[in-house]
Amino acid sequence: MKNITDSFVSLGHWSSAGSFGFNTDILATNPINLSVVLGVLIFFGKGVLSDLLDNRKQRILNTIRNSEELRGGAIEQLEKARARLRKVEIEADQFRVNGYSEIEREKLNLINSTYKTLEQLENYKNETIHFEQQRAINQVRQRVFQQALQGALGTLNSCLTNELHLRTISANIGMFGAMKEITN
């Protein structure tokens, strides 16, 4: 294992003029490093992302099915309300002959309340679908970000030597000192 690590370290010390090799300096990225990181992210993240999306899809489909069942119940209630409306209309015609207008108001109230109930159920269904979609998108984003961060940390930890670590700290301290002098 040490020989493999030494061979990668020695690749980083080759002259860059006219040569081709891995750049082990994490601060000087190149297309090879970027393609390796992207390849690793795609390779390892594809399965997890696919499973996550499938689970989300099933939850959304279940929510849609539940909403459709609620819609079916609302339609059934609407049919009952229509039957009741027909009955009320017949009674209204009988009472209208006698001069009663109270039945007409009850009919309108019944229609309005039924339509309001249907609108509320439709709005609830749409809000539920939208909420589940947003939640799925946010979870996928969070999962992808976590995987990218873990991959980047893994790459950093595997490429970071003590010497490089000390040089990075020294450079950051120097930049901090320069910033402090500028602000004073």
Swiss-Prot record:
Give the GO cellular component terms, alphabetically: chloroplast thylakoid membrane; proton-transporting ATP synthase complex
Q: Supply the alphabetized keyword list.
A: ATP synthesis, CF(0), Chloroplast, Hydrogen ion transport, Ion transport, Membrane, Plastid, Thylakoid, Transmembrane, Transmembrane helix, Transport
| One MF term in the entry's GO annotations | proton-transporting ATP synthase activity, rotational mechanism
Domain of life (superkingdom): Eukaryota
InterPro entries assigned: ATP_synth_b/b'su_bac/chlpt
Tell me more from the record: In plastids the F-type ATPase is also known as CF(1)CF(0).
Family named by the database record: Belongs to the ATPase B chain family.
Q: Which PANTHER family match?
A: ATP SYNTHASE SUBUNIT B, CHLOROPLASTIC
Specify the protein name: ATP synthase subunit b, chloroplastic
